[in-house]
UniProtKB/Swiss-Prot annotation:
InterPro entries: CTDL_fold (IPR016187), EgtD_Methyltrsf_superfamily (IPR051128), MeTrfase_dom (IPR019257), SAM-dependent_MTases_sf (IPR029063), SAM_MeTrfase_EasF-type_put (IPR017805), SUMF_dom (IPR005532), SUMF_sf (IPR042095)
Gene name in the database record: egt1
Source organism of the structure: Schizosaccharomyces pombe (strain 972 / ATCC 24843) (Fission yeast)
Changes seen on gene knockout: Completely lacks ergothioneine and its precursors (trimethyl histidine/hercynine and hercynylcysteine sulfoxide).
Cofactor(s) the protein requires to work: Fe(2+)
Keyword Methyltransferase recorded: yes
Keyword tags: Cytoplasm, Iron, Meiosis, Metal-binding, Methyltransferase, Monooxygenase, Nucleus, Oxidoreductase, S-adenosyl-L-methionine, Transferase
Similarity section: In the N-terminal section; belongs to the methyltransferase superfamily. EgtD family. In the C-terminal section; belongs to the EgtB family.
Protein name: Ergothioneine biosynthesis protein 1
Localization per Swiss-Prot or TrEMBL: Cytoplasm; Nucleus
Biological role: Catalyzes the SAM-dependent triple methylation of the alpha-amino group of histidine to form hercynine and subsequent conjugation with cysteine and oxygen to form hercynylcysteine sulfoxide, the first two steps in the biosynthesis pathway of ergothioneine. May play a role in meiosis.
Length: 773
């Protein structure tokens, strides 16, 4: 007998109480359709040529199962595949065959409500297959209970789960409910777990009507059989099929088919205190089937917190199957308040936990992958320690009070002078041995629950000063999310080292064939820095004068900013010409290849192995030749040398700001949306640059400027964190603007934000564009 685990909850789904509540809404739960007889009748329906949905999906799976398997399965992680509502599994077998052919070990679970029919389907599948790589099991239960115990079916913490939701069953939900249904699964899945889902589009009304009201009246038998299921739940014949007739209605404008049972005459139903009296022609809704255009499908997917990977179309009818993946939580494009909300914190923390719990492991967290930097284990401790130190200024944390020794080891990292490493700002002492990752994860959890969650929930009670501390901690976490990631990619050392935990490989970016186009910018006056006027306090601000009196810097009347962003200044920028896009990998490679082999020094984002060049990405080492159209990322010194070879230079901070203002059509507003660009974890790799005339910014890398970080007029060190900028007024750090694909939107979208790195630093995700006078 095939293994089946019963996860329960059927007694709730099929209870007299749930049916009574449904009848009060003039409907019956559609799950009642699928008793043993109902499943057999539905099987007959799928064999009808009129029921185009089945044939359309079969058409897709026959043609594309191999491609779908490649996208769903991880080649290097354990794979779990769960089908939601498996039915007879004839179509599913096409996918299982493709999984077997791929040669990856897969544990497949078929989920269904009816244990007897599930057992029968699994036995038939086992009798017709002899899989070596695919293990087949069953789960008897409902979707809600599966969500509660989903991790039980994940073979290892890092294993990939792919869900199958076929048959256009998502159409049982209206569009808002469909997105909510997807979100319920997204909330339980890991980043880059997958879902294969089918949608029936808006086919012609005649085709739809025939599919749900066939001339053989099998659909009618199927729908009316729900009354037998109701009677079985109540244990007596409360409903007589002969009192009802099937009514099929398709609303073409709304795009929904509704199946009703209509009372032929007056019907009375009595069971104890339950009493219903249905008048002639009264309608009871049995099920809905919503039809969605491709655009509507994409909206449902996006609102469901998934990202579209690929789409497969049927040639039989307007019907598609989509591979979608759990994406990073969407970050707010335009902050509504100075201090990040709990929802913003939660989105950022999910990224951090993905890094510390999924990407970092015993093989990569103890090695210092970047010279003159700590190993990743330091950052696992640094983030919660920094939060603990600063948030304790607001409220003591009893949960972490006995771990003050962590403060000595993790308060501040190292950033020594590249040219003379003996010169370094003050930093925490390095322990003889680092605490275990589990100890640090528990510490982070305590800091999260007892500090961040409590403070965010009490936001209205916090003073402006206290909100500022909470904001500072949020942006500090965001910065170290990016730092830890660019250190992580340096751990890839072998040519065959690719990982699928971050999803499918990015599409190749072809080498550009044209020089960049030049954008002529006339003499312009710009405002730099955080606005100091009250013109922005209308954006939901409720700050009172009493709040401001407690504020460390009263120039910040709404949004917070770091010390090097303040005060706001006016600058006159002379006319200049700037490239419409950053320098590409291909252009920089051509520049390097003009040198002798002994003089060639490649960017640290590249790796030369056995004479072949690779690029370090979130997906491992990929052939550089496939991504020559991405922006090159290396040090200021490297890119400044390239600019000189082209008879150009790199832009000043004011010039680059002026160009960004022009492209984003911004003036002095604090935040501008970067939706659709390569920042804020909207994707995990740079954008492919283009030869066209578009002005390309936020392409996945920060951008260097020739402006050296210096103490500007009226600069005042950050009172909470005075060493943030002033430790780096050494003439060796250059200002960096924009953001990478891994930069939180509170930072990348803030016009005044200024990053800075040593000009010789090669490891950060920073590119550049050319300028000429």
């Amino acid at each position: 007998m095939t293994e089946i685990e019963n996860i329960g909850a059927l007694e709730v789904l099929f209870s007299p109480e749930s049916i009574e509540q449904s009848l009060k809404r003039c409907q019956l739960p559609s799950t009642l359709l699928y008793d043993e007889k109902g499943l057999r009748l539905f099987d007959e329906i799928t064999n009808l040529k009129e029921y185009y949905l089945y044939e359309s999906e079969l058409d897709i799976l026959k043609k594309f199962s191999d491609s779908i398997a490649n996208q769903l399965l991880s080649p290097d992680l354990p794979n779990t595949v769960i089908e939601l509502g498996c039915g007879n599994m004839r179509k599913t077998k096409l996918l299982l065959d493709a999984f077997e052919k791929k040669g990856c070990d897969v544990h497949f679970y078929a989920l269904d409500l009816n244990e007897a029919e599930l057992q029968k389907g699994l036995q038939e599948l086992r009798q017709t297959t002899n899989y070596q790589h695919v293990k087949v099991s069953g789960i008897c239960g409902c979707f809600e209970r599966l969500l509660q115990c989903l991790d039980r079916f994940r073979s290892e913490p890092n294993s990939r789960i792919s869900m199958l939701y076929l048959g256009a069953s998502i159409g049982n939900f209206d569009r808002k409910s469909a997105a909510s249904f997807l979100r319920s699964f997204a909330s339980r899945l890991n980043i880059h777990d997958n879902l294969l889902i089918s949608f029936d589009h808006r086919n012609k009304a005649e085709l739809v009507q025939l599919a749900y009201d066939d001339p053989y009246r099998i659909t009618e038998k199927f729908e009316k059989n729900i009354l037998a299921s109701v009677n079985a739940v109540f244990g007596e014949n409360l409903f007589d099929e002969n009192d009802w007739e099937y009514k099929s209605v398709y609303d073409e404008d709304l795009g929904v088919h509704r199946a009703y049972l209509q009372a032929k005459n007056e019907v009375t139903v009595i069971k104890g205190p339950m009493f219903f009296q249905f008048k002639p022609s009264h309608l009871i809704l049995i099920e809905e089937s919503w039809k969605n255009s491709d655009q509507e499908c994409r909206q449902i997917i996006e609102k469901g917190d998934f990202k579209l990977v690929s789409k497969y179309e049927s040639t039989i009818a307007d019907y598609s199957t989509y591979v979608i993946t759990k994406q990073f939580p969407a970050m707010l494009q335009l902050p509504l308040q100075p201090c990040p909300s709990l929802a913003e914190w939660d989105a950022l923390r999910k990224v951090w936990l993905f890094i510390t719990n999924k990407l970092l492991n015993k093989d990569n967290m103890y090695t210092a992958w970047i010279p003159l930097r700590h190993p990743p284990i330091f950052y696992i401790g640094h983030v919660p320690v920094f939060n603990d130190i600063y948030l304790t200024k607001i409220v003591k944390n009893k949960a972490t009070a006995n771990k003050k020794h962590f403060w000595e080891w993790f308060q501040r990292g190292i950033d020594p002078d590249i040219e003379d490493p003996s010169k370094c700002h003050w930093h925490s002492e390095v322990p003889e041995s680092w605490p275990s990752p589990d100890q640090l994860r528990e510490y982070e959890k305590e800091s999260w629950e007892y500090h961040i969650v409590k403070l965010c929930k009490a936001m209205d009670e916090l003073s402006t000063s206290e909100k500022r501390i909470l904001w500072l901690c949020y942006e500090h976490v965001a910065m170290h999310v990016e730092t830890t990631l660019y250190i992580y990619v340096q751990s890839f050392q072998n040519a065959n080292q690719t990982v699928s935990i971050c999803g499918s490989l990015p599409e190749p970016a072809e080498k550009l064939t044209k020089a960049p186009l030049w954008v002529n910018v006339p003499e312009t006056e710009i405002a730099v820095g955080m606005p100091l006027t009250t013109q922005y306090t209308s954006v939901g601000s409720n700050l009172q004068s009493s709040d401001l009196s407690a504020h460390e810097n009263t120039d910040e009347l709404f949004y917070f900013a770091w010390d090097n962003e303040k005060p706001m200044r006016k600058k006159l920028v002379s006319s200049f010409s700037i490239a419409n896009r950053p320098i590409s990998n291909g252009e920089y490679l051509d520049f390097i290849n003009k040198k002798s082999k002994t003089e060639r020094v490649y960017p640290k984002q590249w790796a030369e192995i056995d004479g072949t060049l690779y690029i370090r990405t979130m997906y491992g080492l990929l052939p550089l030749d496939d991504y020559l159209g991405w922006p090159v990322m290396t040090s200021y010194d490297d890119l400044n040398n390239y600019a000189s070879s082209q008879g150009c230079r790199l832009p000043t901070e004011d010039e680059l700001n002026c160009f960004y203002d022009r492209v984003l059509e911004r003036t002095d507003e604090p935040y501008v949306s970067t939706e659709g660009k390569a920042t804020g974890f909207q994707q995990l790799h740079p954008l492919a640059l283009s030869d066209n005339s578009s002005n390309q910014i936020f392409t996945g890398a920060w951008e260097w400027t020739s402006t050296v970080l210096e103490k500007h007029e009226d600069f005042e060190p950050e009172e909470l964190y005075p060493d943030y900028t002033r430790d780096f007024f050494d003439g060796k750090h250059n200002v960096v603007l924009g953001g990478s694909f891994a930069t939180a939107t509170r930072i990348s979208n803030r016009r005044s934000f200024r990053n800075f790195y040593q000009a010789g630093y090669k490891y950060a995700w920073i590119g550049a564009r050319l300028v000429k006078n």
